């Protein structure tokens, strides 16, 4: 008998599998999805190995298969093991990242009364059992979750006992939608009737002209025609008449749900590269030609507009010439469209798209067509790193510094850039990171020769002959808003920004105004007692949205009516203060009434269709001004934009996070890079109340090296990454006192364990309330472990439930 080591969809230690015996009637292979019994439940598992001997003496049989064969390749299973071990997540959760859309089996148990039960009162052993059976009898079929809500937390054990007695029947079904290939009916001529059809066509009566036209269309077609379109074009009656004569055959054929269907991509050939671009490209291509040689990873640090995308295109082209395939990742779904256009134009019919903005059917078809080898390139956001690519040769991570590459809301809390490096190690691929403002840890690795550092120091513009030529960076001015106030200007626009906006619009150019805050005003506050309107579930200020007429929490989405009186002192002196994108857009429309202002934030653009529409409007000149948050700072190319105004650069600098300065620098660098990307020079105005801040000064000068040196000095002094590693432990609870007590108890246990083992190099910071201290109705306390190898402490301390472990957190808020 053979056995299988199976990762099961149940809470388990990281890296753990369970042994199951393989029944004779099942063919089980490594990488297959299966159903297995686990305690009283039936759960999904993924087979990690088929072995001759089990880990334990007694095993249970695999119940059934969930996939016809292997869904995961051996390198994907190895990657899952690494993710599980490194990020301290279950092995199943790690492997499930790579399953096809719809590949998760989320079991729900349904109970119904056994047909053998005639009299519930007679069958029950107690009044409680009778009420239980009567409830199921009334509702006929009830799932376990509904039983818990209606009859209490012990209902499942009661149901299990009644199933054993034969009074209830139970069935397990998946609660997730089962995805399949889309089948569409097609029509073709019956080959056995062609002779009869030919005779009829020679003598077809005039009244049957439409039928004859239909026959001609089917004869000329290279493949069967879709039935729905055929009936529309030639008439359902005519199709039916030919079917009655048995002249037609009807088949169900697989039809792909293609997210790029209907989009036109003009063919694009490779452009000439500058000498700097060619030098960088040659280095990357040499690495692709010699996959076993170091470095495994290249970091391209190029100023905004330096032509990094052309490097990516050239590298992917070389990868394909070598018979290998590529993954291209971007940090935001909003950026995928622009990237898709470039790659689909250069490599027609070879590009797949994978991100959460697609429909479930589109994701399913793109995943399977990629696995079947129909596509050589996958473009997508963070999750694209798990695309089922065989023979992988290259992974491109554009804007590699972006925090959105880190999964923060659920396990495993992986970083796609680090996963890319491990995947490349397992497959022999190369990784190409690109950024104008690299993550300081990435730049540190490149200086330590762990990455190959490639630099593009010059911005480029395309001349009239189509060749790229060096172009100046936009001129940047810092405006001290404290001085504006002293001189009597209380407007949100400084006098300099106002003058620059007027000149920009008068010249027929476009402009971007950036503010890292949504809504109309940040806060509603009582001027009598100082009380600030805050979310009842989350410990953060509510944001006022004028058009909705509501105060909205940007964390949990709760909407609140605007109070007439202060809930604290019952006074009437409520005042709005602060600015958001909506109020900036409205102020701009008031200042320049003939200007069309577009707004881009998560309130105005909810899905990928909204993104595409807005980008197209701005690209074609329908809007002269674009107001937005972080999304407009990331890699977008609008040649007509000559002015960028940063309305308030200070937002985010005061957040209690060691990376606040780095994030501010990166955002300001990126948004400044949107100006002057065409033939006309660009200008940037940064408004701030902290004009001497090192991050603001360095971003204005587009001086990454200066910022890096100061930031690294601060981090070395405080022992923060890359000089040490961090692990964040977050505990949540509905009761504040319980949350604090549990956090302090765990911190004491860790301190005792650290001291007992003599690993004093690990600091235990906290516990302290997280920021925000309350979120979605749950209080939050966290502990941060800092040291050369802080996870050594976690190997000896078992965390209770309701704790979340974040390895290498990108934020401590």
Residue ranges and their predicted role:
Residues 89, 100-110, 115, 124, ...:
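C-terminal accessory/connector segments of nucleic-acid motor ATPases
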Residues 168, 248, 351, 476-478, ...:
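Generic structural signal for residues in well-ordered beta-strands
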Residues 268-278, 282, 293-740, 782-784, ...:
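Inter-lobe coupling/hinge segments of SF2-like helicase ATPases
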Residues 1-435, 442, 447-471, 772-778, ...:
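Accessory, non-ATPase domains that flank or precede helicase/AAA+ motor cores in DNA-metabolism machines
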Residues 81-84, 148, 585, 589, ...:
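Generic solvent-exposed, charged/amphipathic alpha-helical segments
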């Amino acid at each position: 008998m053979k056995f299988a080591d199976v990762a099961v969809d149940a809470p388990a230690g990281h890296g753990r599998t369970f042994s199951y015996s393989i029944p004779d009637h099942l063919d089980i292979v490594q990488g297959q999805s299966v159903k297995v019994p686990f305690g009283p439940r039936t759960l999904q598992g993924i087979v990690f190995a088929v072995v001759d001997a089990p880990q334990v003496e007694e095993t249970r049989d695999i119940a059934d298969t969930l996939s016809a064969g292997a869904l995961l390749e051996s390198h994907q299973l190895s990657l899952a093991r690494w993710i599980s071990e490194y990020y301290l997540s279950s092995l199943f959760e790690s492997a499930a990242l790579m399953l096809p859309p719809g590949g998760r089996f989320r079991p729900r148990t349904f109970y119904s009364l056994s047909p053998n039960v005639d009299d519930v009162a007679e069958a029950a052993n107690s009044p409680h059992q009778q009420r239980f059976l009567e409830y199921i009898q009334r509702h006929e079929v009830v799932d376990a979750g509904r039983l818990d809500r209606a009859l209490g937390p012990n209902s499942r054990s009661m149901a299990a006992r009644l199933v054993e007695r034969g009074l209830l029947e139970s069935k397990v079904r998946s609660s997730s939608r089962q995805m399949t290939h889309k089948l569409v009916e097609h029509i073709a001529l019956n080959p056995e009737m062609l002779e009869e059809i030919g005779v009829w066509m020679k003598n077809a009566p005039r009244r049957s002209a439409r039928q004859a036209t239909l026959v001609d269309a089917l004869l000329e077609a290279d493949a069967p025609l879709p039935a729905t379109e055929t009936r529309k074009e030639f008439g359902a009656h005519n199709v039916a008449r030919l079917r009655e004569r048995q002249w037609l055959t009807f088949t169900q054929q697989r039809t792909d749900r293609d997210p790029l269907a209907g989009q036109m991509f003009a063919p694009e050939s490779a452009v000439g590269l500058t000498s700097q671009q060619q030098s960088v490209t040659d280095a990357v291509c040499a690495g692709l030609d010699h996959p076993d040689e170091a470095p495994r990873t290249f970091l391209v640090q190029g100023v905004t507009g330096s032509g990094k995308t052309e490097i990516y295109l050239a590298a992917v082209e070389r990868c394909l010439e070598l018979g290998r395939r590529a993954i291209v990742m971007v940090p935001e779904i909003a950026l995928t469209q622009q990237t898709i256009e470039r790659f689909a134009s250069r490599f027609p019919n070879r590009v797949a798209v994978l991100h959460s903005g697609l429909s479930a059917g589109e994701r399913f078809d793109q995943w399977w067509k990629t696995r079947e080898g129909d596509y050589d390139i996958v473009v997508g956001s963070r999750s694209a790193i798990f695309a089922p690519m065989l023979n992988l040769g290259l992974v491109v991570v554009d804007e590699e510094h972006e925090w959105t590459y880190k999964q923060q809301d659920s396990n495993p809390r992986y970083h796609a850039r680090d996963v890319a490096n491990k995947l490349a190690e397992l497959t022999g691929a190369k990784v190409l990171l690109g950024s104008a403002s690299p993550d300081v840890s990435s730049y540190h690795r490149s200086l330590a020769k762990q990455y190959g550092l490639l630099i593009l120091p010059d911005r480029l513009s395309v001349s009239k002959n189509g060749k790229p030529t060096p172009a100046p960076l936009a001129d940047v001015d810092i405006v001290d808003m404290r001085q504006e106030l002293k001189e009597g200007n209380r407007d949100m626009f400084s006098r300099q920004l106002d003058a620059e906006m007027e000149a920009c619009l008068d010249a027929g150019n476009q402009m971007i105004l950036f503010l890292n805050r949504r809504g109309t005003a940040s806060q509603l506050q009582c001027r009598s007692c100082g009380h600030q309107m805050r979310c009842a579930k989350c410990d953060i200020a509510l944001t006022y949205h004028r058009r909705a007429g509501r105060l909205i929490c940007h964390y949990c989405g709760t909407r609140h009516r605007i109070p007439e009186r202060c809930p604290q002192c019952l006074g009437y002196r409520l005042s709005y203060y602060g600015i958001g994108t909506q109020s900036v857009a409205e102020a701009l429309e008031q200042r320049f009434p003939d200007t069309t202002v577009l707004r881009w934030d998560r309130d105005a653009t909810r899905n990928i269709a909204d993104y595409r529409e807005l980008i197209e409007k701005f690209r074609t000149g329908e809007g002269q001004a674009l107001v937005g948050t972080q999304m407009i700072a990331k890699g977008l190319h609008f040649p007509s934009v000559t002015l960028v105004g940063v309305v308030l650069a200070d937002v985010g600098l005061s957040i209690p996070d060691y990376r606040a300065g780095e994030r501010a620098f990166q955002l300001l660098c990126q948004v400044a890079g949107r100006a002057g990307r065409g033939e006309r020079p660009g200008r940037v105005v940064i408004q701030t109340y902290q004009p001497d801040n090192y991050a603001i000064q360095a971003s204005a000068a587009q001086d990454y090296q200066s910022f890096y040196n100061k930031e690294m000095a601060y981090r070395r002094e405080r022992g923060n990454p890359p000089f040490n590693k961090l692990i964040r432990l977050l505990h949540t609870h509905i009761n504040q006192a319980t949350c604090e007590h549990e956090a302090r108890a765990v911190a004491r246990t860790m301190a005792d364990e650290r001291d007992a083992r003599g690993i004093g190099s690990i600091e235990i910071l906290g516990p302290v309330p997280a920021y925000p201290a309350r979120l979605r109705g749950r209080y939050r306390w966290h502990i941060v472990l800092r040291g050369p190898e802080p996870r050594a402490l976690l190997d000896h301390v078992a965390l209770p439930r309701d704790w979340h472990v974040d390895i290498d957190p990108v934020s401590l808020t």
